[in-house]
Amino acid sequence: MVRNERTLKSTDFPQLPPAPDDYPTFPDKSTWPVVFPMLPPSPDGGPRRPPQHTSKAVAPRLSAAQLPTHVAIVMDGNGRWANQRGLHRTEGHKMGEAVVIDVACGAIELGIKWLSLYAFSTENWKRSVEEVRFLMGFNRDVVRRRRENLKEMGVRIRWVGSRPRLWRSVINELAIAEHMTAGNDVITINYCVNYGGRTEIAEATREIARLAAAGRLNPERITESTITRHLQRPDIPDVDLFVRTSGEQRSSNFMLWQAAYTEYIFQDKLWPDYDRRDLWAACEEYASRNRRFGSA
C-alpha cells in the first residue's frame, strides 16, 4: 500500500500554523463534562480551527512524508487511573472523554488524516454488568455530546464494529454522527465500538465463503485484496502508527488486518493523563524510524 494517500510532496508540511495567543484553549478539566470552547468562524468559511492546548504548545514540524497517514490508538488505563485515586473505575472513563477530543484536535493540528480509537472491544463484554452498562451509555452520550464540536472542525466520524449485542441506542447515535459529518474531509475518526480484529476477519471470511458457495466468486482467485474489500470499512488505509497508552505492550485484537506493517509505540501514561503533546511525541518517534516493509 502507498505510504501516504495525499498528493503532497515530501517537502510539504501539513501542520496548521500556530494559533493566535488569544485563541480558545482546551481542555479545562475543572468541570465535567469538560466544556468545549466557542470557536471563531474560519476566515474562508470552512472548518474551524481546533482550540489550542491549554499549554499553548505547537505541533512539531513534520513533512508529509514523515507523517503517519493513519494512527490507531488503544486508549488504555482508565480503570487503573481511577483505582490509583480510590475512585470507581467509571470515573476514569469519564476523565478520558476530554482526552479523546484533545487528541482529535492535536491530530488535526499535526495533519493526520485518519485516527482510529478503540472505545469498546468485543472482549469488553467480559467485564462486570455494571461497567458494561456504564460503557454502553457513556459511549452513546459521548458521541451525542461531542459530534457537533467535531463536525465544526471538519471531522468525519464513522463507527467501526459489529452489531451483535451492541445497544441500539449506541448504533443510532453513531449513525446520526456519521450522517451529519459525512461531507467532512479534514480528518476521519473511526470510533471503534464492539470491535475485534479477529471478529472483523471472521465476518469477512464468512461473506467470501457465501459468495464462493453461490458461485459468484472463484476460490482460486481470492487474494488479500478480496479480504480487504469485505472488511467492515474497506477504505480504511493500513495503520502506520499504532499507539497504546498505560505501558502495556500488546495489540489487544485491534486492527489486526490493517496493522500488518504498523510501527508500534507504547507510552506509559494512563489515558486520562494523556494529551495531544503525547500524540505528537509518538509521531516524532515514528518519523525517526526506517520502515522497510520487508525489504532489506
Swiss-Prot record:
InterPro entries: UPP_synth-like (IPR001441), UPP_synth-like_CS (IPR018520), UPP_synth-like_sf (IPR036424). Residues 1-58 are annotated as: Disordered. It comes from the Bacteria. It is found in: Cell membrane. GO terms for biological process: polyprenol biosynthetic process. SUPFAM superfamilies: Undecaprenyl diphosphate synthase (SSF64005). GO terms for cellular component: cytosol; plasma membrane. It holds the Pfam family Prenyltransf. The keyword Methyltransferase does not apply. Keywords: Cell membrane, Magnesium, Membrane, Metal-binding, Transferase. It catalyses: (2Z,6E)-farnesyl diphosphate + 7 isopentenyl diphosphate = (2Z,6Z,10Z,14Z,18Z,22Z,26Z,30Z,34E)-decaprenyl diphosphate + 7 diphosphate; n isopentenyl diphosphate + (2E,6E)-farnesyl diphosphate = a di-trans,poly-cis-polyprenyl diphosphate + n diphosphate. Gene3D superfamilies: Decaprenyl diphosphate synthase-like. Mg(2+) binds at residues 76, 263. Catalyzes the sequential condensation of isopentenyl diphosphate (IPP) in the cis configuration with (2Z,6E)-farnesyl diphosphate (Z-FPP or EZ-FPP) generating the 50 carbon product trans,polycis-decaprenyl diphosphate. When (2E,6E)-farnesyl diphosphate (E-FPP or EE-FPP) is used in vitro, both primary products decaprenyl diphosphate and (2E,6E,10E)-geranylgeranyl diphosphate (EEE-GGPP) are synthesized. M.tuberculosis does not synthesize (2E,6E,10Z)-geranylgeranyl diphosphate (EEZ-GGPP) and heptaprenyl diphosphate. This is Decaprenyl diphosphate synthase. It comes from Mycobacterium leprae (strain TN). The gene is uppS.
